UniProtKB/Swiss-Prot annotation:
Topology with respect to the bilayer: Multi-pass membrane protein
Keywords of this entry: ATP synthesis, Cell membrane, CF(0), Hydrogen ion transport, Ion transport, Membrane, Transmembrane, Transmembrane helix, Transport
Protein name per its UniProtKB record: ATP synthase subunit a
Gene: atpB
Localization terms from the record: Cell membrane
Transmembrane intervals: 29-49, 53-73, 82-102, 111-131, 143-163, 179-199, 220-240
Coarse class of the protein's main subcellular location: membrane
InterPro entries from the UniProt entry: ATP_synth_F0_asu, ATP_synth_F0_asu_AS, ATP_synth_F0_asu_bact/mt, F0_ATP_A_sf
Pfam families according to UniProt: ATP-synt_A (PF00119)
Organism taxonomic ancestry: Bacteria, Pseudomonadati, Elusimicrobiota, Elusimicrobia, Elusimicrobiales
Subunit description: F-type ATPases have 2 components, CF(1) - the catalytic core - and CF(0) - the membrane proton channel. CF(1) has five subunits: alpha(3), beta(3), gamma(1), delta(1), epsilon(1). CF(0) has three main subunits: a(1), b(2) and c(9-12). The alpha and beta chains form an alternating ring which encloses part of the gamma chain. CF(1) is attached to CF(0) by a central stalk formed by the gamma and epsilon chains, while a peripheral stalk is formed by the delta and b chains.
Length: 248
C-alpha cells in the first residue's frame, strides 16, 4: 500500500506504447497533453460567452494583473505584446501545479524533468529576446561590461554565462522542490498511520486522528504554495528576460 502511494505521486511511469511509433510516452507526458488540451478547450468555451460571467471576469482580472504587474513592470509599455506568452505560462503552471490536488491525479511539476523543460523554455525566451532586441553581438557584449580589463574579459564572460544557466537551474529546482515537498509531507503522515497499525492496531487508530488533521492542514498550505510558486516562476522568468531585453 505504501509503495503504491509513493510510486503514484513521485515516480513518472513509462508506458510501452509509443506515439507514432517513435515518441516514448509516460504518465507525465500524457498529463501534459491533457492539461494543454483542457486549457485550450476551457478558454475556447469561455471566449464564446457573449455576456460577462464570473469566471470570465476573474480571468480578465488575472490577465490585467499579469500585464501590469509582471510584463509592463519588467519590459515597459512596449513589452505588452509579450502578455499572451506570460498569461499562457501562468495559467499552464497553475493547472500543472494544481492537478495533484485532485484524487488519483498527479502534480507533473513534482517531476524534475518537467521543471527542467519549463526552465529551458524560459532560458530560450531570455536568449531570444536578448538577441532580437540587441542583435547577437550586442547581446554577447553585455556579458562583459565596458571598461573591463582585457585579461579579465574571458573570466567574466564565463561567469556571466554560468550565471545565466545557474538562474535557469534555480528556476527548475525551486519549482520542483516546493511542489514535491508538500506531497512528501502528506505521504509521510499517511504512511505513519500504516506503520503504527502494523505495530499495533490501537496505536494506528490513535495516530490516524492527528495524522489526518495534519494532512488536511498541509493540503490547505499546498493551495497557497501552488499560487505562490506559479507567480514566482512567472515573475522570475519576466525579470530575467527583462534584463536581457533591456540591454542596448
Amino acid at each position: 500500500m505504501i509503495e503504491e502511494i509513493l510510486t503514484h505521486h513521485i515516480i513518472d511511469h513509462k508506458l510501452t506504447y509509443k506515439l507514432f511509433g517513435v515518441i516514448p510516452l509516460s504518465s507525465n507526458l500524457i498529463t501534459l497533453f491533457c492539461i494543454t488540451i483542457g486549457v485550450f478547450i476551457l478558454f475556447t468555451l469561455i471566449a464564446k460567452f457573449r455576456r460577462p460571467v464570473l469566471l470570465m471576469t476573474a480571468i480578465e482580472g488575472l490577465v490585467v494583473f499579469i500585464r501590469d504587474e509582471i510584463v509592463v513592470a519588467n519590459f515597459g509599455e512596449h513589452g505588452k505584446k509579450l502578455t499572451p506568452y506570460f498569461c499562457t505560462l501562468f495559467i499552464f503552471l497553475l493547472f500543472s501545479n494544481s492537478l495533484g490536488m485532485i484524487p488519483q491525479m498527479r502534480t507533473i511539476t513534482g517531476s524534475i524533468s518537467v521543471t527542467i523543460g519549463m526552465a529551458l523554455t524560459s532560458l530560450s525566451l531570455i536568449i531570444f529576446l536578448g538577441v532580437k532586441q540587441n542583435g547577437l553581438l550586442g547581446y554577447l557584449k553585455h556579458f562583459v561590461p565596458e571598461g573591463t580589463p582585457w585579461f579579465l574579459a574571458p573570466l567574466l564572460f564565463f561567469l556571466e554565462i554560468l550565471g545565466l544557466f545557474t538562474k535557469t537551474a534555480a528556476l527548475a529546482l525551486r519549482l520542483f522542490a516546493n511542489m514535491i515537498a508538500g506531497h512528501m509531507v502528506i505521504i509521510c503522515f499517511i504512511c505513519l498511520i500504516f506503520i503504527m497499525t502494523a505495530i499495533n492496531k490501537y496505536a494506528g487508530i490513535f495516530t490516524a486522528i492527528p495524522s489526518t488533521g495534519l494532512s488536511l492542514f498541509v493540503n490547505l498550505l499546498e493551495v497557497l504554495v501552488i499560487l505562490i510558486q506559479t507567480y514566482v516562476f512567472t515573475l522570475l522568468t519576466a525579470i530575467f528576460a527583462g534584463e536581457a531585453y533591456a540591454h542596448h
